[in-house]
């Protein structure tokens, strides 16, 4: 059993919500005035907040790109027909937010502001320029149009004005002045009974992170960001909501199943875990208080692995040493990964078997219950694995979601076996060689050479034009 020591700073935030399921912080923070304009250039605030700025800038040290498709080629099949089958890297430092969304193959290679596969909403978690544009043009004005339209405007990396009311006099004095800079996030928090203005300071810390580290979808003709929390925040609640509005992100090109793509639901999974239930916030673990050279405490903005600052994070509550806790986390991660792979294997077979049934003449009515099972199985799998830290945030919930995903995938395959038999197909459906990312992409008919060549041309020609225009308009520091 994990032993926990409670220090004075955390006693109320750890115990009271456990027994009363309410916010531990009786004090309420007044809503800070919204800025008339949002200053998106992060460098502007370096003189006022030098330690925070330098530590934020140090997220550029988290530069390694890890190709998740190369690590696990099954993903290519599960996302067949969707840009994630082209390119999917694990997350890295906030300093690369704009660079990575520009350079990923998923955003395509648009030639002009009206070109490309994705909407403006794909910028929404990448830059304080998003808050600036929403403040300037309103949400409808911001969301309107294609992703490429925002290229010359959204140029500063995720930073100060995403989380802080930087125009506040209190911010200039060194106060945090947290704010929800995305109105759609504020509405979502209100919908689940957590209005930001009435939340305690520690609750607000996690809500600010929850603007982006969250599941969302693109709603309506304008493709505006919305959180699917109307029926609740658990995987089944969101699944029910999506089914009710008949939403899908794309149709899998093999099984022709209308699919859901989970994003990065850290807020939902953290809420379901032991830390969230005890109000141990994102900040406590990922942005601890540290000392500068003069011995002054400040919040470390080099957001990263809590084990990198063990004495200031885990050791505030846990009595075990670093090695012991790392072992626990590694074991949880391995358990989740083992079940993840088993679910993926079932889903890969289900997609190819569904394709075989369709090729054999299966009707829409015959396929509907099978496709529902595939949709629900992959959604539950995806919500578990898209939250990269679920082995730490909510390992029990991760295993539960993956377990139900396995059940749904098995149901789909059982129904497929029966359906295929009615079409005279009783032999095992052969799966092509998908042992590497490249072979898997070839199996679903992707011309990766062309896709990569078009992207390289875009990077060399279009992005420099965007940056030149941004500098002319004073949006980038010279």
Swiss-Prot record:
Positions with a binding annotation for Ca(2+): 215-216, 261, 263
Binding site for heme c 4: 282, 285-286, 393
Enzyme nomenclature, EC number: 1.7.2.2
Main localization of the protein described in the UniProt heading: periplasm
Pathway(s) this gene product operates in, as recorded in its UniProt entry: Nitrogen metabolism; nitrate reduction (assimilation)
Annotated positions binding substrate: 216, 264
Domain of life the protein comes from: Bacteria
Catalytic activity, reaction form: 6 Fe(III)-[cytochrome c] + NH4(+) + 2 H2O = 6 Fe(II)-[cytochrome c] + nitrite + 8 H(+)
Residues that coordinate or bind heme c 2: 160, 163-164, 301
A cellular-component GO term for this protein: outer membrane-bounded periplasmic space
Binding site for heme c 3: 94, 209, 212-213
SUPFAM superfamilies on file: Multiheme cytochromes
Top-level enzyme category: oxidoreductase
Role noted for this protein: Catalyzes the reduction of nitrite to ammonia, consuming six electrons in the process.
Family designation: Belongs to the cytochrome c-552 family.
Protein name: Cytochrome c-552
Organism of this sequence: Escherichia coli O157:H7 (strain EC4115 / EHEC)
Highest classification ranks of the organism: Bacteria, Pseudomonadati, Pseudomonadota, Gammaproteobacteria, Enterobacterales
């Amino acid at each position: 059993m994990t032993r926990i020591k409670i220090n004075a700073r955390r006693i109320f935030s750890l115990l009271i919500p456990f027994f009363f399921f309410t916010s531990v912080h009786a004090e309420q923070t007044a809503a800070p005035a919204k800025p008339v304009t949002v200053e998106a250039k992060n460098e502007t605030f370096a003189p006022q907040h030098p330690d925070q700025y330098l530590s934020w800038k140090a997220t550029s040290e988290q530069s390694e790109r890890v190709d998740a498709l190369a690590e696990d080629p099954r993903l290519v099949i599960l996302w067949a027909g969707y840009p994630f089958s082209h390119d999917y890297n694990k997350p890295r430092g906030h300093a690369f937010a704009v660079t990575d969304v520009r350079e990923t193959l998923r955003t395509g290679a648009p030639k002009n502001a009206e070109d490309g596969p994705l909407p403006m909403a794909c910028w929404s978690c990448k830059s304080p320029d998003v808050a600036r544009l929403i403040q300037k043009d309103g949400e409808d004005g911001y969301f309107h149009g294609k992703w490429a339209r925002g290229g010359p405007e959204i140029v500063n990396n995720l930073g100060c004005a995403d989380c802080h009311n930087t125009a506040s006099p209190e911010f200039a004095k060194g106060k945090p002045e947290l704010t929800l800079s995305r109105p759609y996030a504020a509405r979502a928090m209100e919908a689940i009974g957590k209005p930001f203005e009435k939340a305690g300071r520690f609750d607000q810390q996690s809500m600010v992170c929850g603007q982006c580290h969250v599941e969302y979808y693109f709603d309506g003709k304008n493709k505006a960001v919305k959180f699917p929390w109307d029926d609740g925040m658990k995987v089944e609640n969101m699944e029910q909501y999506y089914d009710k509005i008949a939403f899908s992100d794309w149709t899998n090109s093999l099984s022709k199943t209308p699919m859901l793509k989970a994003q990065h639901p850290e807020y939902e999974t953290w809420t379901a875990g032991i830390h969230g239930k005890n109000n141990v916030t994102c900040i406590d673990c990922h942005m601890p208080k540290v000392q500068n050279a003069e011995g002054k405490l400040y919040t470390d903005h080099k957001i990263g692995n809590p084990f990198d600052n063990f004495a200031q994070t885990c050791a505030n509550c846990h009595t075990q040493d670093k090695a012991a806790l790392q072992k626990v986390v590694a074991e949880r991660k391995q358990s989740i990964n083992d079940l993840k792979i088993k679910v993926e294997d079932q889903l890969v077979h289900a997609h190819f078997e569904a394709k075989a049934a369709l090729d054999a003449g299966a009707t829409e009515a015959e396929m509907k219950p099978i496709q529902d099972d595939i949709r629900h199985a992959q959604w539950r799998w995806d919500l578990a694995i898209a939250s990269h830290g679920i082995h730490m945030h909510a390992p029990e919930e991760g295993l539960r979601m993956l377990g139900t995903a396995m059940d749904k995938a098995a149901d789909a395959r059982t129904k497929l076996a029966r359906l295929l038999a009615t079409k005279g197909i009783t032999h095992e459906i052969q799966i092509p060689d998908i042992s590497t990312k490249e072979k898997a992409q070839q199996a679903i008919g992707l011309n990766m050479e062309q896709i990569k060549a078009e992207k390289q041309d875009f990077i060399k020609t279009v992005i420099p034009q965007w940056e030149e225009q941004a500098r002319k308009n004073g949006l980038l520091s010279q």
